[in-house]
């Protein structure tokens, strides 16, 4: 899509009648960041900012969550003290995430959808207003931070309800145009 642009027709679906990705943040008094991935059965507690700024390890089960905090500007890309950052936020927090009914490597864009769910949860937790375009651009930023180069439209599919016609123009800066397609009930 960088050379020629891209066009995709995409539909969001429920799996077994449920949204397969859930992310929730909870505030806590302790000045640390906790990630809890229920589907992967991993739990991590972070008290040093440097640990949260490292996202390049493909085997790190929390690389995606760390990239979210960086892309959203919650954690600075370099320097600073986690204690100071969390004091300004009024305390630490736990980010719970769970992906259900979707096998890894299914091709359903689960990592992009999880990324978007993390961004949305952070924005809502912080009281930051956002648009669909904000979600898309932050997920693309996360993919750049992690150097994963995910699908340019994956995050649109599962985050934006219904049937969508998605296009992008050629170029590095991928601005997505999303047109919601109405389907008559007949």
What spans do the regions from the language model cover?
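Membrane-interface helix caps and helix-loop-helix hairpins in membrane proteins
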Residues: 148-149
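Active-site signature of alpha/beta-hydrolase-fold catalytic machinery across serine-
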Residues: 117
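Short, active-site-adjacent segments that bind or coordinate small-molecule cofactors and metal centers
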Residues: 154-161
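Short, conserved phosphate/pyrophosphate- and ester-handling motifs at nucleotide-, phospho-/glycolipid
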Residues: 111
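Short alpha-helical scaffolding segments that buttress acidic/His motifs in well-ordered protein cores
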Residues: 139-142, 156
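ATP-binding N-lobe of GHMP and related small-molecule kinases
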Residues: 1-108, 120-132, 137, 161-163, ...
């Amino acid at each position: 899509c960088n050379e020629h642009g891209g066009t995709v027709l995409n539909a969001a679906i429920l799996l077994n009648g449920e949204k397969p990705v859930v992310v929730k943040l909870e505030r806590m008094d302790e000045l640390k960041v906790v990630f809890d991935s229920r589907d992967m059965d991993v739990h991590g507690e972070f008290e040093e900012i440097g640990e949260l700024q490292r996202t390049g390890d493909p085997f790190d089960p929390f690389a995606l969550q760390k990239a979210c905090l960086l892309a959203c500007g919650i954690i600075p890309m370099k320097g600073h003290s986690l204690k100071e950052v969390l004091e300004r936020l009024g305390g630490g927090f736990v980010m719970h995430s769970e992906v259900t009914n979707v096998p890894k490597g299914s091709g359903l864009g689960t990592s992009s959808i999880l990324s978007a769910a993390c961004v949305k949860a952070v924005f809502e937790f912080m009281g930051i207003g956002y648009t669909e375009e904000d979600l898309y651009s932050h997920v693309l930023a996360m993919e750049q931070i992690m150097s994963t180069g995910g699908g340019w439209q994956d995050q649109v599919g599962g985050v934006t309800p219904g049937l969508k016609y998605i296009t992008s123009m050629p170029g590095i800066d991928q601005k997505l145009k999303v047109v919601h397609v109405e389907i008559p009930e007949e």
